[in-house]
Amino acid sequence: MNKFYLSAAVVAASLTLPALPAMAQANEIVIGITVTTTGPAAALGIPERNALEFVPKEIGGVPIKVITLDDGGDPTAATTNARRFVTESKADIIMGSSTTPPTVAVSTVANEAGIPHFGLAPFPITPERAKWSVAMPQPIPIMGKVLYEHMKANKVKTVGYIGYSDSYGDLWFNDFKKQGVPMGMTVATEERFARPDTSVAGQALKLVAANPDAILIGASGTAAALPQTTLRERGYKGLIYQTHGAASMDF
């Protein structure tokens, strides 16, 4: 289901929350959405912004006001946007962002303010965040288990990892160690790269030299293609696994 078709259901569900009687009786529902429409993750944020055209103008007779801001994938900018939603827009609901690091930042603000937050990217829902934050994408442990089971079925014993040098990369690497390693696989080598990087040649050479049975790429959006194309150019012939965060029209 498209995440923004789901957002209408999210708003409707929010109206039923006991903690939000004021919002249910309001003259309008204000939704602040911070997404990444510029920078390396724009391939994720632009479709999210465009999908807002399909958000209904009202639910249950209550008008909906949607305010959209760009954070460029920067946690600091996402924090600023979220605080604007709280202090200036008086938002009833906050959504965003498009990638994990700024989503964590938005969650922090939403939880401080006591405003429902719906993340559009996977992020760790710690006990202190669970009261106000929900991650809309499929949880990484669920998606990861399917990948690791496929690896096991294909006799993969050693796995090389290359992922973002941020919280999204950490989530996937830690999940592989938690679920994949107990299935009988070992980490051959771990490499990282930054989202804006235009080359991962050095990391690819190390991965090729390690010659693992498979390589897991913990990246999202257009930049997730960079390690895969580089690995093939450097002669890697093994299996390459992408995550569900890599899915985009540009990829």
Regions found by a protein language model. Give the residues of each.
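Bacterial N-terminal signal peptides that target proteins for export
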Residues: 1-9
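Sec/Tat signal peptide C-region and signal peptidase I cleavage site
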Residues: 17-24
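Short N-terminal segments immediately surrounding and downstream of signal-peptide cleavage
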Residues: 24-40
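Beta-alpha junction/loop-to-helix N-cap segments that form part of ligand/metal-binding clefts
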Residues: 28-30, 43-50, 58-126, 193-200, ...
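Structural recognition of the beta-strand scaffold that forms the well-ordered cores
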Residues: 30-34, 65-68, 92-97, 116-121, ...
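Short helix-capping segments at alpha-helix termini
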Residues: 58-63, 112-115, 180-186, 232-238
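Extracellular/periplasmic Venus flytrap/periplasmic-binding protein
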Residues: 80, 124-126, 131-235
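Extracellular/periplasmic periplasmic-binding protein-like sensory domains
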Residues: 228-251
